[in-house]
Curated annotation (Swiss-Prot):
The EC number(s) this enzyme carries: 2.3.2.27
Protein's organism: Homo sapiens (Human)
Name listed for the protein in its UniProt record: E3 ubiquitin-protein ligase RNF149
Composition skew (Basic and acidic residues), residue ranges: 389-400
Predominant subcellular localization, coarse grouping: membrane
């Protein structure tokens, strides 16, 4: 389970990294550029010929051009003077009509031209050749009160602004009537507009779709693996439980000191390679091989066969398929007159030294074989201590 948790953690970090990448790309200005522009304050003033009153209005309704110096300008308003009524001021020889109050001459003036017909740069250069102090372009009628960015690189230090169509037509009509109109231009509010370029939008969309596909594929793979692993764990636990019940039918014997025991040619456990000691609990397989119980039970749970002769112990007990696929066989009954819990003994030397080697009597703690402690929990579950004795006509004592 640990490696699966690590795999899930790595996958989650990958998804998080992709999400952070997409968010970073979506931050305004991350892949695009910032647009900075300034609004213009437009102040117009004139004398109404009917009432002889001065009329003036101030509004922040203009917008400076991209290449225009952000500074103020002042002068009388002049409009293109052409026989055909060309108000766009595109022709190189365009002349401007500037009504002057009181017949004064050589006063600073501001060119008012309509948008269209040529580039912004051409309009500005034509007015600059006529010594205009500033150029005011009014937008087309279809845009209403909207002003748009203007690109006019290479026009020098002349002030260039754009005003809306209604505002431009209002001033134009006054000038065409011969009314002198004075315009004062001031610097308005600074605006910063950040945006993402079209290529960045496409890139972010592709990255997001890729992230979603990878995340979905990883989640599907993860949950399929988790489902399969959970199913195998449940099946394995059920199988081990049934196998423990079958192994519990094998006979158990307790080693006693000083008694002649069963006729088995074995002095030690083939699993832990330790000699059998007093009070050791051993298990005898159908093939007559003996092992420590805490050593052989975990082995049989995993392999089902005798470690020495490879006999299938489960089949030898009458289970031809998986332990859970057949019914349990009844445990063998003990012979009449015998206590089924009686201990059988293994041949060990007496204390008087009559045998070749006489190991000292071991305490219960010392006589326990040094098998893997992790096996003890599995080996102790569902284990039945079945002990039976048989009489030997020759010795009159316990035999194998």
């Amino acid at each position: 389970m640990a490696w699966r948790r690590r795999e899930a953690s790595v996958g989650a970090r990958g998804v998080l990294a992709l999400a952070l990448l997409a968010l970073a790309l979506c931050v305004p200005g991350a892949r695009g550029r910032a647009l900075e522009w300034f609004s213009a304050v437009v102040n117009i003033e004139y004398v109404d010929p009917q009432t002889n009153l001065t009329v003036w209005s101030v509004s922040e309704s203009g917008r400076f051009g991209d290449s225009s110096p952000k500074e103020g300008a002042h002068g009388l308003v002049g409009v293109p003077w052409a026989p055909g009524g060309d108000l766009e001021g595109c022709a190189p020889d365009t002349r401007f009509f500037v009504p002057e109050p009181g017949g004064r001459g050589a006063a600073p003036w501001v060119a008012l031209v309509a948008r269209g017909g040529c580039t912004f740069k051409d309009k500005v250069l034509v007015a600059a050749r006529r010594n205009a102090s500033a150029v005011v372009l009014y937008n087309e009628e279809r845009y209403g009160n909207i002003t748009l960015p203007m690109s006019h690189a290479g026009t020098g230090n002349i002030v260039v602004i754009m005003i809306s169509y209604p505002k431009g037509r209002e001033i134009l009509e006054l000038v065409q009537k011969g009314i002198p109109v004075t315009m004062t231009i001031g610097v308005g509010t600074r605006h910063v507009q950040e945006f993402i370029s079209g290529q960045s939008v496409v890139f972010v969309a592709i990255a997001f779709i890729t992230m979603m596909i990878i995340s979905l594929a990883w989640l599907i793979f993860y949950y399929i693996q988790r489902f399969l692993y959970t199913g195998s764990q449940i099946g394995s636990q059920s199988h081990r439980k049934e196998t423990k019940k079958v192994i519990g039918q094998l006979l158990l014997h307790t080693v006693k000191h000083g008694e002649k025991g069963i006729d088995v040619d074995a002095e030690n456990c083939a699993v832990c390679i330790e000699n059998f000691k007093v009070k050791d609990i051993i298990r005898i397989l159908p093939c007559k091989h003996i092992f420590h119980r805490i050593c052989i039970d975990p082995w049989l749970l995993d392999h089902r066969t005798c470690p020495m002769c490879k006999l299938d112990v489960i089949k030898a007990l009458g289970y031809w398929g998986e332990p859970g696929d057949v019914q349990e066989m009844p445990a063998p009954e003990s012979p009449p007159g015998r206590d089924p819990a009686a201990n059988l003994s293994l041949a060990l030397p007496d204390d008087d030294g009559s045998d070749d080697s006489s190991p000292p009597s071991a305490s219960p703690a010392e006589s326990e074989p040094q098998c893997d402690p992790s096996f003890k929990g599995d080996a102790g579950e569902n284990t039945a201590l079945l002990e039976a004795g048989r009489s030997d006509s020759r010795h009159g004592g316990p035999i194998s």
